[in-house]
């Protein structure tokens, strides 16, 4: 039986060698730090180059969430772990239910702690993940793959599209090297890595930057913030309780003790506390007002009696 010939991947931007780091093994510690710092500047440039696609993705995600859909990140290895990381931060930051933003990682929870890179080669597993999560046309699926070719991710996106689901593709190679028929193609071109092929470096950094923008941007559109304050923060520990009190103090004329009392009266809900204070409404009436305006504090306040 003839030996299977592996597909050549050397043409991919993320697999190429970086001419700036050819003497990597000869650098001093300070020179290493300087080189990393220099190369990491390219992540900012890459985000700027994808600004219109990132904005389009925010619109798709926020529209879907506003209509009762969910956001799913799906990936393998570092890319998948970054999706999980961004997803699990949404409930404490924006008080969202855990099912609203979810990260799907090839290999499941165990792959968070132990590398399971071989699982990324199975496209059928990606498709099965879409079925297992009962993804529908109301949802949005964001496929993340630094090199742009991961079968697990493409299998998931193909299955999602077949269900009428909106799809977004994030890769760190040009579309000509790894095409994908997604609704939005986000290409974060940071160039070859300092350590050739190690996409946990610049590619990982720029991917996390992009996910920060997508999730936070969508939550801003959904009214989860007021100004630049996280008024939907879930008060689940002393640090977050202190933050909630400081938000109330900064946005009202209350002292710290009064702000703490208001927070208690609102059931530890900053957004509700602010509307109660500004409008004079009871907690029940203020909550009803927020509900009428989809939880948007600014709109609820503008319409308050």
Curated annotation (Swiss-Prot):
CDD domains: SIS_Etherase
Pathway: Amino-sugar metabolism; N-acetylmuramate degradation
Superkingdom, taxonomy of origin: Bacteria
Active-site positions on this chain: 89 (proton donor), 120
Record has Transit peptide as a keyword: no
SUPFAM superfamilies: SIS domain (SSF53697)
GO molecular function: carbohydrate derivative binding; carbon-oxygen lyase activity; ether hydrolase activity
Enzyme's top EC category: lyase
Keyword line: Carbohydrate metabolism, Lyase
EC annotation from Swiss-Prot or TrEMBL: 4.2.1.126
One Pfam family in the UniProt entry: GKRP_SIS_N
BP term (GO), one: peptidoglycan turnover
Annotated ranges, domain SIS: 61-224
Catalytic reaction annotation: N-acetyl-D-muramate 6-phosphate + H2O = N-acetyl-D-glucosamine 6-phosphate + (R)-lactate
InterPro entries: Etherase_MurQ, Glucokinase_regulatory_CS, MURQ/GCKR, SIS_dom, SIS_dom_sf
Gene3D superfamilies in the cross-refs: 1.10.8.1080, Glucose-6-phosphate isomerase like protein, domain 1 (3.40.50.10490)
Function: Specifically catalyzes the cleavage of the D-lactyl ether substituent of MurNAc 6-phosphate, producing GlcNAc 6-phosphate and D-lactate.
Family: Belongs to the GCKR-like family. MurNAc-6-P etherase subfamily.
HAMAP family hit by this protein: MurQ (MF_00068)
Complexes and interactors: Homodimer.
Note: A lyase-type mechanism (elimination/hydration) is suggested for the cleavage of the lactyl ether bond of MurNAc 6-phosphate, with the formation of an alpha,beta-unsaturated aldehyde intermediate with (E)-stereochemistry, followed by the syn addition of water to give product.
Protein name: N-acetylmuramic acid 6-phosphate etherase
Native source species: Synechocystis sp. (strain ATCC 27184 / PCC 6803 / Kazusa)
Gene: murQ
């Amino acid at each position: 039986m003839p030996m299977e010939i592996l597909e050549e991947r050397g043409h991919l931007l993320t697999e190429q060698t970086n001419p700036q780091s050819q003497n990597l093994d000869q650098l001093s510690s300070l020179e290493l730090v300087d080189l990393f710092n220099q190369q990491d500047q390219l992540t900012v440039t890459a985000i700027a180059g994808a600004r219109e696609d990132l904005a389009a993705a925010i619109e798709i995600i926020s529209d879907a969430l506003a209509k009762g859909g969910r956001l799913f990140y799906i990936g393998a290895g570092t890319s998948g772990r970054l999706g999980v990381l961004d997803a699990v931060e949404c409930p404490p930051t924006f008080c969202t239910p855990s099912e609203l933003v979810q990260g799907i990682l090839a290999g499941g929870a165990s792959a968070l702690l132990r590398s399971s890179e071989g699982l990324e080669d199975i496209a059928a597993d990606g498709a099965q993940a879409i079925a297992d999560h009962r993804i529908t046309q109301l949802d949005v699926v964001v496929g993340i793959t630094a090199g742009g070719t991961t079968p697990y991710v493409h299998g998931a996106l193909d299955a999602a599209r077949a269900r009428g689901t909106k799809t977004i593709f994030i890769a760190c190679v040009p579309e000509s090297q790894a095409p994908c028929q997604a609704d939005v193609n986000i290409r974060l071109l940071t160039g070859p890595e300092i350590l050739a092929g190690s996409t946990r470096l610049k590619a990982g950094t720029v991917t996390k930057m992009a996910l920060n923008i997508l999730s936070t941007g969508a939550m801003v559109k959904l009214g989860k913030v007021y100004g630049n304050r996280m008024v939907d923060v879930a008060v689940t520990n002393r640090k977050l309780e202190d933050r909630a009190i400081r938000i109330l103090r900064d946005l009202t004329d209350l002292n710290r003790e009064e702000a703490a009392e208001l927070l208690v009266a609102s059931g530890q809900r900053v957004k509700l506390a602010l509307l109660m204070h500004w409008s004079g409404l009871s907690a029940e009436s203020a909550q009803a007002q927020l509900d009428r305006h989809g939880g948007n504090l600014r709109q609820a306040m503008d319409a308050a009696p």
